[in-house]
Amino acid sequence: MSTLAIDIGGTKLAAARVDDDLRIRERRELPTPASKTPDALREALKVLVEPLQTTAQRVAIASTGIIREGALLAINPHNLGGLLHFPLVPTLEDLTGLPTLAVNDAQAAAWAEYHALASDVRDMVFITVSTGVGGGVVSDGRLLTGMSGLAGHLGHTLADPQGPVCGCGRRGCVEAIASGRGIAAAAQGSLAGCDARTVFAHAAAGNEQAVRLVQHSAQVVARLIADVKATTDCQQVVIGGSVGLAEGYLAQVRHFLAQEPAVYQVALSAAHYRHDAGLLGAALLAQGDK
């Protein structure tokens, strides 16, 4: 059977026709509509999926935010604008006529990455460091989503009580400091106004401030991993996202994690499926128990 997998992010929408062996047969991308309105998103999704839906038997969605009863929510509702409570599952079922499943994108990515690990790994955590920081937890071979879809939102654990205010309303969340947005917000002087990609480029060129910003992000993520190990006793942590997969970033996380006590050490690896993990994880979930 073929699954129409959809990844809904803050900057782009992706869709792919995925076989049961997780091979992507066809793929399309569009920018996420700048106008955060239900009509704009519905129209963009219609344009995105129309060429792919004719050969699919089901739809699987990996989306930013919290998915609750098929609708789109968020820890920070302002991020969604007019899309708060957008009926994601009913909309795709109406557009395609196919049974539809929806899950948080980091939870979906965790499920894909879990299946890429050795068979003796039953407990793992996926952390994505990108525009924000998210995560997914697999415990004893089962993906944890929680009663309300909140499970795995690791970016909203506390890193620094005196740190910057996070979009969720707390002060000093991991996301507010270690994410691409957090890195950019902390840049000053000649780097003020730079995005995270530019900060990383300056760090590679030896700019001292940029090096410190990237190091601080990696240190905060390493401390998060130590906390995750203490909380879940996971066997493996997988890192993804545009920041997490940036050149040299994982090595820095390893460096800072090695400074934590031995009990908090855990195997680290980069995401096997790279930026397709969300799409493929949603497709896997739609296939049922694996």
Curated annotation (Swiss-Prot):
Q: Which UniProt keywords apply?
A: ATP-binding, Carbohydrate metabolism, Kinase, Metal-binding, Nucleotide-binding, Transferase, Zinc
The keyword Glycoprotein appears for this protein: no
List positions binding ATP.
5-12, 132-139
Q: Which PROSITE patterns match?
A: ROK
Provide the leader sequence positions.
Answer: none
The pathway entry for this protein reads as: Amino-sugar metabolism; N-acetylneuraminate degradation; D-fructose 6-phosphate from N-acetylneuraminate: step 2/5
Reaction catalysed by this enzyme? an N-acyl-D-mannosamine + ATP = an N-acyl-D-mannosamine 6-phosphate + ADP + H(+)
Q: Which domain of life is it from?
A: Bacteria
Q: Which GO terms describe its biological process?
A: N-acetylneuraminate catabolic process
**What family is it from?**
Belongs to the ROK (NagC/XylR) family. NanK subfamily.
The cross-references to HAMAP family, in alphabetical order and at most eight, read: ManNAc_kinase
Q: In UniProt terms, what function does this protein have?
A: Catalyzes the phosphorylation of N-acetylmannosamine (ManNAc) to ManNAc-6-P.
Descriptive protein name = N-acetylmannosamine kinase
Q: What is the lineage of its organism?
A: Bacteria, Pseudomonadati, Pseudomonadota, Gammaproteobacteria, Enterobacterales
